[in-house]
Curated annotation (Swiss-Prot):
This is UPF0145 protein CPS_2458. It comes from the Bacteria. It comes from Colwellia psychrerythraea (strain 34H / ATCC BAA-681). Belongs to the UPF0145 family. Pfam families: YbjQ_1. PANTHER family: UPF0145 PROTEIN SCO3412, UPF0145 PROTEIN YBJQ. InterPro entries: UPF0145_dom_sf, UPF0145_YbjQ-like.
Amino acid sequence: MIYSTTESIPGKEIEEIVGVVTGNVVQAKHIGRDIMAGLKSIVGGEIRGYTEMLTDARDIAIQRLVANAEEKGADAVVGIRFTTSAIMDGSSEIMVFGTAVKLKK
């Protein structure tokens, strides 16, 4: 499955727009990471535990987007965008969305 933030795939022609597809995940903070984050916020620097958590969450959201596109018979997803939001205290959602398309063979 090809997926891209661009509206087209170089060297490929879009034959049909299948529709909007999404993938999301809600990730909760880990108490150990939260303690380290509190310390890092005092001294500064990257909070690696959160970086890793968000990277994993983004990857899961992309996998779900691809699965959604495959269920609809798409060959690619174009124009993908990411959004984040706080769901409740201590958890965040990462959502990825885009347009599923069929490519000319």
